[in-house]
């Protein structure tokens, strides 16, 4: 591995690609480790230079110099981390087990470096007299707080304990993610009788047949990936099969196998609690919320409980309506279980509004939706998108676009990655391969490279990729995040784009979701993939009318996730109990459907155990409150109004 020369390793030197994009076509697994080790070495040398600078510590020679350090390491780690989520394999995951502790150790070596912190503190203590710009003040504030929040004020045994705990945590979160992906990929429900498929739309049956065929099997294979799981739960008439698939999904990482996350959940929660207490906080939520708009757990609980009170009566009425419909079909003793909810909700929606996802799907062909979403950005901001096949990508399904601003200046690179794969984790997210910053020496505005990653319905042999309305909303959501990243315009990369308070970060994404039911927007792209017919006004009106169908139940579900998150991270004593029982107690006031004791959300709740949302899941609802206010201006002034945008 270490025989690779710098010249052979694509991470070294300048990328010879359009806009210096990542040369994915040249990167192999063996390139990561030597580049990361060299990146650590280079940043250590840069930090030594800051410490050994004979000049008195000032903003330029300490704060800015630290901000600019670690360029090679950042470059490699951004690719490595993103590949672990979007295009991983056994070799990469094995390497991650070796690399992640090294990165944790390196991070600790920086924040626990007493001489470096002394210089940072020296500048911070003079902040009132330095006449800094607003950006410079923010950078200084962030740098100082980051050191303090990562153990710089700890001494002796406490410092060593902090090192130990943070290294353990990096391994635990990695294991959690890997187990989740492997457990998801390991399950398949193979059906061999045609009658088992009753109720399922043709496109779903075709996709299941292709999944089975790709593995040399006869029949129809259904998986735990959203484009397979969600339609099955919504349309399959066979209740026993819905039950089977539901249980497979909702007991992920709880089984007696190597993918079990029960102990890992306990360890992550306990380790975060210990880190927070070591740093002087009563619990992990208090530690996290100190740097959020919400500021403390009282404000979070106030929001969650207010919303809980507001949603519950309507959600209970929604449940009653669905239950009544089910009893008309199944008899008065029938009790709706969680594996029945989507099925009967969909039937009721169809009955009330004469609309369902499959009715809309032919109008949402992926290429057309993409044109519509890109066109919306063009109308609002004047930006344009140009596909560039010369830009290397990490998988044949990924596309790369150059994005230009209204003056025709290069703005950003946008990668799009739409469909599920074995090496891709579940969900949808926006990420970056390169942040934006302004080069101090040349004045050049170095533009960002952004990616949106989804798990949308795949094309089949007979049909293009036809999205559900829910997938269209998801596209708009993640595209909102990408706009936030692409419009970044800061001097410093650590302040640019989505590097904002976490409970603000969901605002741009949720504003974009609002466009999904706007007739003027839908008319720009929604065409039947076979006939070219525009989405009829009558269908749009039904879509608008149905947009609040069972919305209270859906909101209550989000509240339940927020309550579960806070239950794990407001603990101030270690947890040694039963994870499933604790979970059921934590969110019981937000549950309307009967509890299924064997199920567990925590073991697969990547947002709070492996992502950035620990003690932060409430931020979706926080941003919704802000977003309702913000979008009302578009409604008032016109949805394509550039002045509002």
Where are these regions (language model features)?
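N-terminal helix-rich structural modules
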Residues: 3-200, 206, 634
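C-terminal, non-catalytic "cap/extension" segments appended to globular domains
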Residues: 4-31, 38, 214, 219-221, ...
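Short His/Asp/Glu-rich catalytic/ion-coordination signatures at enzyme active sites or charged loops
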Residues: 16-31, 80-99, 122-164, 223-263, ...
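Intrinsically disordered or highly flexible coil/loop and linker segments, enriched in small
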Residues: 41, 45, 49-56, 72-89, ...
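Membrane-interfacial helix termini and the short, flexible loops that connect transmembrane helices
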Residues: 51-55, 83-88, 236, 244-245, ...
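Short, hydrophobic/amphipathic alpha-helical patches that form generic packing surfaces
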Residues: 72-82, 141, 145, 247, ...
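Active-site-proximal, well-structured secondary-structure segments within enzyme catalytic domains
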Residues: 135, 139, 163, 168-171, ...
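Short pre-active-site segment immediately N-terminal to the catalytic Zn-binding motif
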Residues: 365, 456-476
